[in-house]
Amino acid sequence: MSTIVSVWAREILDSRGNPTVEVEVSLESGHTGRAAVPSGASTGSREALEMRDGDKGRYKGKGVEKAVDNVMGEIAEAIVGLDSLRQVQVDNTLLDLDGTDNKSRLGANAMLGVSLATARAASSFLGLPLYQYLGGVNAKVLPVPLMNIINGGAHAPNNLDIQEFMIMPIGAATFRDALRMGAETFHTLKALLAADGHVTSVGDEGGFAPNLKNHDEAFRYIMKAIEEAGYIPGAEIALAIDAAASEFHKDGKYVLAGEGKNLSNSEMVEWLGEFTTRYPLISIEDGLAEADWDGWRELTYKLGDTIQLVGDDIFVTNPDILAEGIDEGVANSILIKLNQIGTLTETLDTIEMAKQAAYTTVISHRSGETEDHFISDLAVGLNAGQIKTGSLCRSDRLAKYNQLLRIEEDLDDTGIYFGPMMSSHFGFEEEGEE
């Protein structure tokens, strides 16, 4: 009854108006699962391949009809008849069928859509919430959200080199409280920016994209917004950034165009470290470029005992690359993006490896998103503890937050918000200093 009987795919649009793949998997029992695949703007060079048509006369070359055809052709032929409850078998079938290291023959967007839709169909067949199907009886941890409230870099047309400035409501008692604290800070920040004559348009992930003097001014605005919203910076709401340093790493230097600086990797480490002394900055993602492993080792040596250092572009959710990083002493946390690796099974393997090595895990969206909220269930199902899914506006971002509210309600008093554990893990109880 849980046997896959049909697979369907279609081309839909993501939050940037670009095509992406949506897949539906139907079972013999009549249960179905649907999943839509996100897309990134700043991407790691070793990510699994997102297949695009390349026809400039249609969606400016970004159509995904080839990926859709692959789902409804080769992939459907291979997985119809398989048991949806055997996720590993389904995903291994996809991997064998593709036969490449980077999913370049069938496309990671085609494969991931099928993989996630299969999991949804299986959870529906069993009558279980997706988070419980993914994680079992011990799925109970509500993640701390890393809320992107100021955008720069590749995500916004302004003079900020750092791609994301985020807030983390670590002092909340529940996820519901954390969401409220974040929303109140977001709206306070909007008012502060508007009062000073800054544009309050938003970037791809819903954060504001003002032209500011420098990065310190961005931090100061956020600190003021936290305080005027009635919260204590550091103790109740901490700060995080995604530098996305690969985007401005050129010829061995970190070119901070907005600040007129060209830094070596050691100077970049020092520059980032200075922010941690001035502000309650507890998490830095992609502080160095993906190819700069020497810089990453230095960053980890100098800051890894006190703050979270998240590897995104350097690891691309790949268990083999993460294993290298663990051996090399690089970072202490990994960003998990489903479409970087292309199947649910490989994603779960990466998360398990990270936990075994005492690396924290941050489940993440992409800048090109849909209304699909699979990552919310994944974050709770795997007790990941953190989720990065954008700002407090745009329905594609709020869909994930709202699903977490539903999950927390479903868990009732058995749910645990990760904020206090995040504080104790890195020792962030003290209020940060400006």
Curated annotation (Swiss-Prot):
<protein>
    <recommendedName>
        <fullName>Enolase</fullName>
        <ecNumber>4.2.1.11</ecNumber>
    </recommendedName>
</protein>
<keyword id="KW-0479">Metal-binding</keyword>
<feature type="binding site">
    <location>
        <position position="367"/>
    </location>
    <ligand>
        <name>(2R)-2-phosphoglycerate</name>
    </ligand>
</feature>
<dbReference type="InterPro" id="IPR000941">
    <property type="entry name" value="Enolase"/>
</dbReference>
<comment type="pathway">
    <text>Carbohydrate degradation; glycolysis; pyruvate from D-glyceraldehyde 3-phosphate: step 4/5.</text>
</comment>
<keyword id="KW-0324">Glycolysis</keyword>
<feature type="binding site">
    <location>
        <position position="285"/>
    </location>
    <ligand>
        <name>Mg(2+)</name>
    </ligand>
</feature>
<keyword id="KW-0964">Secreted</keyword>
<keyword id="KW-0460">Magnesium</keyword>
<dbReference type="Pfam" id="PF03952">
    <property type="entry name" value="Enolase_N"/>
</dbReference>
<feature type="active site" description="Proton donor">
    <location>
        <position position="205"/>
    </location>
</feature>
<feature type="binding site">
    <location>
        <position position="366"/>
    </location>
    <ligand>
        <name>(2R)-2-phosphoglycerate</name>
    </ligand>
</feature>
<dbReference type="GO" id="GO:0004634">
    <property type="term" value="F:phosphopyruvate hydratase activity"/>
</dbReference>
<dbReference type="InterPro" id="IPR020811">
    <property type="entry name" value="Enolase_N"/>
</dbReference>
<comment type="function">
    <text>Catalyzes the reversible conversion of 2-phosphoglycerate (2-PG) into phosphoenolpyruvate (PEP). It is essential for the degradation of carbohydrates via glycolysis.</text>
</comment>
<dbReference type="InterPro" id="IPR020810">
    <property type="entry name" value="Enolase_C"/>
</dbReference>
<feature type="binding site">
    <location>
        <position position="242"/>
    </location>
    <ligand>
        <name>Mg(2+)</name>
    </ligand>
</feature>
<dbReference type="GO" id="GO:0009986">
    <property type="term" value="C:cell surface"/>
</dbReference>
<dbReference type="GO" id="GO:0005576">
    <property type="term" value="C:extracellular region"/>
</dbReference>
<dbReference type="GO" id="GO:0006096">
    <property type="term" value="P:glycolytic process"/>
</dbReference>
<comment type="similarity">
    <text>Belongs to the enolase family.</text>
</comment>
<feature type="active site" description="Proton acceptor">
    <location>
        <position position="337"/>
    </location>
</feature>
<feature type="binding site">
    <location>
        <position position="312"/>
    </location>
    <ligand>
        <name>Mg(2+)</name>
    </ligand>
</feature>
<feature type="compositionally biased region" description="Basic and acidic residues">
    <location>
        <begin position="47"/>
        <end position="56"/>
    </location>
</feature>
<feature type="binding site">
    <location>
        <position position="388"/>
    </location>
    <ligand>
        <name>(2R)-2-phosphoglycerate</name>
    </ligand>
</feature>
<comment type="subunit">
    <text>Homooctamer.</text>
</comment>
<feature type="binding site">
    <location>
        <position position="163"/>
    </location>
    <ligand>
        <name>(2R)-2-phosphoglycerate</name>
    </ligand>
</feature>
<dbReference type="Pfam" id="PF00113">
    <property type="entry name" value="Enolase_C"/>
</dbReference>
<keyword id="KW-0456">Lyase</keyword>
<keyword id="KW-0963">Cytoplasm</keyword>
<feature type="region of interest" description="Disordered">
    <location>
        <begin position="29"/>
        <end position="56"/>
    </location>
</feature>
<dbReference type="InterPro" id="IPR036849">
    <property type="entry name" value="Enolase-like_C_sf"/>
</dbReference>
<dbReference type="InterPro" id="IPR029017">
    <property type="entry name" value="Enolase-like_N"/>
</dbReference>
<dbReference type="InterPro" id="IPR020809">
    <property type="entry name" value="Enolase_CS"/>
</dbReference>
<dbReference type="GO" id="GO:0000287">
    <property type="term" value="F:magnesium ion binding"/>
</dbReference>
<feature type="binding site">
    <location>
        <position position="337"/>
    </location>
    <ligand>
        <name>(2R)-2-phosphoglycerate</name>
    </ligand>
</feature>
<dbReference type="GO" id="GO:0000015">
    <property type="term" value="C:phosphopyruvate hydratase complex"/>
</dbReference>
